[in-house]
Amino acid sequence: MKIIINTTNLRKGGAIQAASAILEDIKSIVNHEFHVFLSPSMFSNIRSLDFPEHIYIYKCKYPSKISLLNYDLNRLELSIKPDCVFSVFGPTYWNPISPHVMGFANGIHLYTDLPFYKKLNFYKKSKKII
């Protein structure tokens, strides 16, 4: 399979750490071809660009919030012809043509039994649900 891993919307913090861990993990998955789109922050965070030959690295700009202006990403996708696109976290501000899977990292929407959640007032809990 040809898989695009999209990190172009990631800027700092835990998202960068999670994406870096994914990049380390895919080094050992040699039966797929990975095309990794890196944000400027991700590119500067990578310790080494020494990746195996089944991983292709692209330094990209941060995507525009107007998805029609993301020509570079669209052009790359058309030339790669991936089987799917995996965006580490959303929102991506880019709508690929290929099937798209997007990660989700806001635990409060998943784990309402967290101690933090119990301390929220009714209004804030309602806002999180909506």
Predicted regions and their residues:
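Acceptor-binding helix/loop patch of EC 2.4 sugar-transfer enzymes
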Residues: 101-129
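Short catalytic/ligand-binding loop motif for oxyanion handling, primarily in non-cytosolic enzymes
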Residues: 12-14, 43-46, 93-96, 109-112
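A basic- and aromatic-enriched beta-loop-alpha substructure that forms the phosphate/nucleotide-
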Residues: 87-93, 103-108
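Short, glycine/charged-enriched secondary-structure capping and boundary segments
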Residues: 18-21, 49-53, 95-102, 115-118
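Active-site donor-binding segments of glycosyltransferases and PAPS-dependent sulfotransferases
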Residues: 4, 19, 29-91
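A short, glycine/small-residue-rich beta-strand->loop->alpha-helix junction that serves as a flexible
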Residues: 6-20
